[in-house]
C-alpha cells in the first residue's frame, strides 16, 4: 500500500502556466469578447420580433459560430487553471492568472447577458427562425431556454454591475472558503506519532478500522473547524445575502426557483422526489441502528457513521483499484472499459492526497482536447475505489458527448442529469463485487460501503437541503453567526437522521467545509445528487431487464443531456419523474440492501 497515487497530466493542453500558447489563447478569448460586442450591436440589436425568420436564422447561425469557438477556448483555459488551483491552493501564479482571466473576460460575460436579454425580447420570432435547418435549429433548446430565462434578468446596467461586483463579492467569498479550508491542517497522534494532516486526510479517518482513531479524528476535526468558523460564517453570509438580493431584484420567487430552473425540473418533480425520500427515513434509520448494534451501541455517534464493518481489512493499492474498475466496466460494455483504461494510461486522474489540494472528488471536461480530468483523494479504501468509478462515469458521460460532436452549448448538462453515468458506473462495480462474494463478512463490508453512500445521498442530502432552506430564509432578515449556522445544521441532522444517530454526537460544522454551500451561481447544490442516485438506480433496473440493447439508447441519452429538460429525457425511457412511483421503485432497490444488511 506504499504506492503513491498519480497526479494528473495536462501537458497536451498547455506545457505550463508560462506557455506562450496559454497567453495567446487568453488574449484571443478577450479579443473575441470585443468582437462579439460589436457583432451584437451591429447585427443583433436592430432585429426585432417582426424580423424575417430567414434573416433571423442567418444571424443566429453566425452568433452560434462565434459563441462556440469562444466558449470552447474559455472553458479549456478555465479547466487548465483549475487543475493547478484545485491541487495546490498555494500556487500564486495560477491564482493570479485565474483572477486576471476572470476580470478580462467580464466584458464578454456582460455581452452574453445582453444577448440573452435580446433573445427574450424577440422570443415570439424564435419558433419560425429555429424551424429552419442549420446550427440554430440544432441549438433550439438552448436558445429557447435562454429566451425564457431572460424574464429573470435585471436591467442591462444592473446586470453588468452585478457581474462586475461578483468578482469582489460572491465569487471572492467562494474562493476564500476554498483557500481557507484547503490550507487548513490538523495535528493528530497516529500510532504514537504526531502527524500534521490536511483536512481531507483527517476527514478520511472517519473510515479507519480503529474506533479510537475515528473518535479522535472526529473530535480533532470539530476543534479545528471551530478555529476558522468566523471567516467561514462570513463567507456563507456574504454569498447567501448576495443571492437573496439578486433573486429579489430579478423577480425570482426564492433561491430554490433558480435552482430548479438550472436543474431543468419543476417543483412537482422535486416535491414528489423529496416526499418519497422523507418517507424512506425510517428505513435508513433501521440501517443506522443495525450498524450501531454492531458496535454495542443503541444509536450511532457521528464518528461511527462511516466506520467499516464486516471483513474490513481489504485494502486496494491504486493498481488493484484500477484493475477492479476496468474488469467490471468491461462487463457492462467494452467501450466503457476502454475509455477508463485510457484515463488511467494517460494520467487523467489526480489521486494523491497532499497539502493544498481540495477535498472530495470531481471530474471536469477539457473540451479543446475532448478529454476529461478527475480529482480524488485515494486512500486505498473500497469507498475511494467506488469514488474513482463514480468520477470515471462522469468522464464517460463527457466522452459520449464528445463522440456525438456536441457543442459547448449542447453539452451544458444540469446537475440532475449529470449524475446519470456516475451512478451507473458505481452500481456496475458494486453489483459485480457483491455477486462474487461468498464470505458473509465480506458481503457485509461491501454492503456497508454502498449503504454509507446511499444514506449520504438520501438522508444527508435532505439535511443539507433543510439547512440551506433555513439559512436563505433567515439571511433575508439578518446575518447569521457561526453559532447559529451550527445550530441550524444540527437541527437539520436531527430532522433527517432522527433516532438513527446519537444526538450528543452530531456534526454541527458540516456547513464549514462542503463547497456546495458556497456557490453563488448554483444554490441548493444538493438535491440534484439525490435525483442522480435515484434516476441512475432506475436506469440500471431497466438495463437489467433489457440487457445489451439498452447500451445504444443509454449512450444516446448521455450525449443529449444538455439538449432537453429532465422530464422529456426521462420520458424516452418511459419514466415519469413527476410521479412518486418511479422514486419509490428506486428506493425499493436500496431497501433490499438494507434488509440484507440487517440479516447479516
Task: List where the protein language model places each region.
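Short pre-active-site segment immediately N-terminal to the catalytic Zn-binding motif
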Residues: 313-318, 369-389
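A well-structured
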Residues: 1-311, 599
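Post-HEXXH active-site segment of zinc metalloproteases
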Residues: 386, 398-423
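Active-site recognition of the HExxH zinc-binding catalytic motif
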Residues: 251, 379-399, 422, 427, ...
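Gly/Pro-rich turn-and-neighbor structural signature
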Residues: 301-359
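Post-HExxH zinc-binding segment in Zn-dependent metallohydrolases
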Residues: 412-441, 450-452, 456, 532
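Active-site scaffold of zinc-dependent metalloenzymes
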Residues: 354-381, 398-399
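C-terminal, non-catalytic "cap/extension" segments appended to globular domains
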Residues: 1-5, 11, 17-18, 130, ...
